[in-house]
Amino acid sequence: MSEQAVKVTNINNWVLGLTGGIGCGKTAVSNMLEALGICVVDADIIARQVVEPGSEGLKAIVTHFGADILLADGNLNRSALRELVFSNNEHKNWLNTLLHPLIRQQIIIDLNNATSPYVVLVAPLLFENGLDKYCNRTLLIDVPKNVQIERTVKRDNISLEQVNSIIAAQMSREQKQQQADDILNNDRSLTLVKHDLIALHKGYLKLALK
Protein backbone atom coordinates (compact mmCIF):
# COMPACT_ATOMS: atom_id res chain seq x y z
CA MET A 1 0.00 0.00 0.00
CA SER A 2 1.39 3.42 -0.93
CA GLU A 3 1.93 6.12 1.68
CA GLN A 4 -0.81 8.23 0.06
CA ALA A 5 -3.30 5.37 0.37
CA VAL A 6 -2.85 5.12 4.15
CA LYS A 7 -5.48 7.29 5.80
CA VAL A 8 -3.93 9.78 8.21
CA THR A 9 -6.23 11.28 10.83
CA ASN A 10 -3.92 12.60 13.57
CA ILE A 11 -2.25 16.01 13.33
CA ASN A 12 1.02 16.39 15.22
CA ASN A 13 1.60 20.14 14.75
CA TRP A 14 0.00 23.21 16.32
CA VAL A 15 -2.35 24.59 13.65
CA LEU A 16 -3.67 28.11 13.09
CA GLY A 17 -6.74 28.20 10.87
CA LEU A 18 -6.78 31.37 8.76
CA THR A 19 -10.01 32.31 7.03
CA GLY A 20 -12.02 35.19 5.61
CA GLY A 21 -14.46 35.92 2.83
CA ILE A 22 -13.49 36.55 -0.78
CA GLY A 23 -11.44 39.75 -1.19
CA CYS A 24 -10.53 40.00 2.52
CA GLY A 25 -6.79 39.56 1.93
CA LYS A 26 -6.13 36.02 3.22
CA THR A 27 -3.26 35.48 0.77
CA ALA A 28 -1.53 38.75 1.69
CA VAL A 29 -1.68 37.85 5.40
CA SER A 30 -0.54 34.25 4.86
CA ASN A 31 2.38 35.58 2.77
CA MET A 32 3.39 37.78 5.72
CA LEU A 33 3.35 34.76 8.04
CA GLU A 34 5.36 32.77 5.50
CA ALA A 35 7.94 35.58 5.47
CA LEU A 36 8.18 35.10 9.26
CA GLY A 37 9.19 31.47 8.68
CA ILE A 38 5.79 29.83 9.18
CA CYS A 39 4.71 26.96 6.90
CA VAL A 40 1.43 27.61 5.06
CA VAL A 41 -1.00 24.96 3.80
CA ASP A 42 -3.55 26.44 1.37
CA ALA A 43 -6.79 24.49 0.91
CA ASP A 44 -7.46 26.20 -2.45
CA ILE A 45 -4.08 25.10 -3.83
CA ILE A 46 -4.70 21.53 -2.63
CA ALA A 47 -8.16 21.61 -4.25
CA ARG A 48 -6.41 22.31 -7.57
CA GLN A 49 -3.73 19.67 -6.99
CA VAL A 50 -6.22 16.82 -6.44
CA VAL A 51 -7.61 17.34 -9.96
CA GLU A 52 -4.31 17.74 -11.81
CA PRO A 53 -3.71 15.58 -14.92
CA GLY A 54 -3.02 11.99 -13.87
CA SER A 55 -4.75 12.35 -10.49
CA GLU A 56 -7.45 9.96 -9.28
CA GLY A 57 -9.73 12.97 -8.78
CA LEU A 58 -9.54 14.05 -12.43
CA LYS A 59 -9.96 10.48 -13.69
CA ALA A 60 -13.19 10.16 -11.69
CA ILE A 61 -14.49 13.52 -12.99
CA VAL A 62 -13.82 12.49 -16.61
CA THR A 63 -15.56 9.14 -16.05
CA HIS A 64 -18.58 10.94 -14.60
CA PHE A 65 -18.89 13.96 -16.91
CA GLY A 66 -17.12 12.77 -20.06
CA ALA A 67 -13.93 13.87 -21.85
CA ASP A 68 -15.54 17.20 -22.86
CA ILE A 69 -14.79 18.37 -19.32
CA LEU A 70 -11.08 18.55 -20.29
CA LEU A 71 -9.19 21.33 -22.04
CA ALA A 72 -7.09 20.49 -25.11
CA ASP A 73 -3.95 20.19 -22.92
CA GLY A 74 -5.57 17.59 -20.64
CA ASN A 75 -6.25 19.94 -17.74
CA LEU A 76 -9.67 20.27 -16.14
CA ASN A 77 -11.91 22.89 -17.77
CA ARG A 78 -12.86 24.62 -14.53
CA SER A 79 -15.32 27.06 -16.04
CA ALA A 80 -17.19 24.20 -17.77
CA LEU A 81 -17.30 22.22 -14.52
CA ARG A 82 -18.47 25.30 -12.61
CA GLU A 83 -21.35 25.75 -15.05
CA LEU A 84 -22.34 22.08 -14.75
CA VAL A 85 -22.49 22.07 -10.94
CA PHE A 86 -23.73 25.62 -10.37
CA SER A 87 -27.35 24.89 -11.29
CA ASN A 88 -27.42 21.14 -10.61
CA ASN A 89 -27.41 20.02 -6.98
CA GLU A 90 -26.97 16.36 -7.93
CA HIS A 91 -23.76 17.13 -9.83
CA LYS A 92 -22.61 19.44 -7.03
CA ASN A 93 -23.19 16.81 -4.32
CA TRP A 94 -21.41 14.14 -6.37
CA LEU A 95 -18.40 16.42 -6.87
CA ASN A 96 -18.23 17.37 -3.19
CA THR A 97 -18.45 13.70 -2.15
CA LEU A 98 -15.51 12.94 -4.44
CA LEU A 99 -13.26 15.89 -3.71
CA HIS A 100 -13.75 16.73 -0.02
CA PRO A 101 -12.15 13.50 1.31
CA LEU A 102 -9.22 13.84 -1.14
CA ILE A 103 -8.66 17.47 -0.11
CA ARG A 104 -8.96 16.72 3.63
CA GLN A 105 -6.51 13.84 3.45
CA GLN A 106 -3.89 15.95 1.64
CA ILE A 107 -4.43 18.83 4.08
CA ILE A 108 -3.69 16.50 7.03
CA ILE A 109 -0.57 15.11 5.31
CA ASP A 110 0.72 18.63 4.55
CA LEU A 111 -0.03 19.89 8.09
CA ASN A 112 1.95 16.98 9.53
CA ASN A 113 4.86 17.57 7.14
CA ALA A 114 5.27 21.21 8.27
CA THR A 115 8.51 21.91 10.15
CA SER A 116 7.89 25.44 11.51
CA PRO A 117 6.93 26.10 15.19
CA TYR A 118 3.29 26.21 14.07
CA VAL A 119 1.55 25.79 10.71
CA VAL A 120 -1.15 27.90 9.04
CA LEU A 121 -4.13 26.31 7.29
CA VAL A 122 -5.64 28.85 4.87
CA ALA A 123 -9.22 28.01 3.91
CA PRO A 124 -11.99 30.37 2.76
CA LEU A 125 -14.59 27.83 3.96
CA LEU A 126 -12.76 26.85 7.16
CA PHE A 127 -15.91 26.86 9.32
CA GLU A 128 -18.38 25.88 6.59
CA ASN A 129 -16.44 22.70 5.73
CA GLY A 130 -15.57 21.81 9.34
CA LEU A 131 -11.82 22.28 8.79
CA ASP A 132 -11.61 24.27 12.03
CA LYS A 133 -11.67 20.93 13.89
CA TYR A 134 -8.04 20.47 12.75
CA CYS A 135 -7.04 23.84 14.25
CA ASN A 136 -5.82 24.81 17.71
CA ARG A 137 -6.86 28.41 17.09
CA THR A 138 -8.58 30.38 14.32
CA LEU A 139 -7.89 33.82 12.83
CA LEU A 140 -10.44 35.72 10.75
CA ILE A 141 -9.16 38.27 8.21
CA ASP A 142 -11.96 40.81 8.23
CA VAL A 143 -13.05 43.74 6.06
CA PRO A 144 -16.46 45.43 5.59
CA LYS A 145 -18.66 43.98 2.84
CA ASN A 146 -18.35 47.06 0.59
CA VAL A 147 -14.54 46.74 0.67
CA GLN A 148 -14.83 43.01 -0.07
CA ILE A 149 -16.97 43.72 -3.14
CA GLU A 150 -14.78 46.57 -4.41
CA ARG A 151 -11.54 44.55 -4.10
CA THR A 152 -12.97 41.41 -5.71
CA VAL A 153 -14.55 43.19 -8.71
CA LYS A 154 -11.24 44.98 -9.33
CA ARG A 155 -9.00 41.92 -8.79
CA ASP A 156 -11.02 39.21 -10.57
CA ASN A 157 -12.68 41.40 -13.20
CA ILE A 158 -16.11 39.90 -12.46
CA SER A 159 -19.55 41.46 -12.16
CA LEU A 160 -21.13 42.81 -8.99
CA GLU A 161 -23.80 40.12 -9.30
CA GLN A 162 -21.18 37.34 -9.37
CA VAL A 163 -19.40 38.73 -6.30
CA ASN A 164 -22.65 39.00 -4.37
CA SER A 165 -23.58 35.40 -5.23
CA ILE A 166 -20.15 34.18 -3.99
CA ILE A 167 -20.54 36.15 -0.74
CA ALA A 168 -24.10 34.84 -0.28
CA ALA A 169 -22.83 31.24 -0.57
CA GLN A 170 -20.35 31.78 2.28
CA MET A 171 -21.02 32.04 6.01
CA SER A 172 -21.97 35.60 6.96
CA ARG A 173 -19.35 38.01 8.25
CA GLU A 174 -21.14 38.18 11.61
CA GLN A 175 -21.17 34.39 12.02
CA LYS A 176 -17.46 34.19 11.23
CA GLN A 177 -16.72 36.94 13.73
CA GLN A 178 -18.55 34.95 16.41
CA GLN A 179 -16.74 31.69 15.60
CA ALA A 180 -13.18 32.97 15.20
CA ASP A 181 -10.79 33.10 18.17
CA ASP A 182 -9.01 36.16 16.78
CA ILE A 183 -9.95 38.85 14.25
CA LEU A 184 -7.52 40.91 12.16
CA ASN A 185 -8.99 44.04 10.59
CA ASN A 186 -7.49 44.24 7.08
CA ASP A 187 -9.21 47.49 6.08
CA ARG A 188 -6.23 49.61 7.22
CA SER A 189 -2.72 50.52 6.17
CA LEU A 190 -0.28 47.65 5.60
CA THR A 191 1.89 48.99 8.45
CA LEU A 192 -0.93 48.68 10.99
CA VAL A 193 -1.98 45.24 9.73
CA LYS A 194 1.63 43.98 9.95
CA HIS A 195 2.01 45.42 13.46
CA ASP A 196 -1.07 43.59 14.74
CA LEU A 197 -0.21 40.40 12.86
CA ILE A 198 3.27 40.25 14.40
CA ALA A 199 1.71 40.62 17.87
CA LEU A 200 -0.66 37.73 17.10
CA HIS A 201 2.24 35.70 15.66
CA LYS A 202 4.23 36.09 18.90
CA GLY A 203 1.21 34.87 20.84
CA TYR A 204 0.82 31.84 18.56
CA LEU A 205 4.52 30.98 19.00
CA LYS A 206 4.06 30.95 22.78
CA LEU A 207 0.98 28.74 22.53
CA ALA A 208 2.63 26.37 20.06
CA LEU A 209 5.80 25.96 22.11
CA LYS A 210 4.00 25.28 25.42
Curated annotation (Swiss-Prot):
PROSITE patterns: DPCK (PS51219). GO terms for molecular function: ATP binding; dephospho-CoA kinase activity. GO terms for cellular component: cytoplasm. Pathway: Cofactor biosynthesis; coenzyme A biosynthesis; CoA from (R)-pantothenate: step 5/5. Pfam families: CoaE (PF01121). GO terms for biological process: coenzyme A biosynthetic process. ATP binds at residues 23-28. Its EC number is 2.7.1.24. Disulfide bonds: none annotated. InterPro entries: Depp_CoAkinase (IPR001977), P-loop_NTPase (IPR027417). Residues 15-210 form the DPCK domain. It is found in: Cytoplasm. Keywords: ATP-binding, Coenzyme A biosynthesis, Cytoplasm, Kinase, Nucleotide-binding, Transferase. It catalyses: 3'-dephospho-CoA + ATP = ADP + CoA + H(+). HAMAP family: Dephospho_CoA_kinase. Belongs to the CoaE family. Catalyzes the phosphorylation of the 3'-hydroxyl group of dephosphocoenzyme A to form coenzyme A. This is Dephospho-CoA kinase. It comes from Pseudoalteromonas translucida (strain TAC 125).
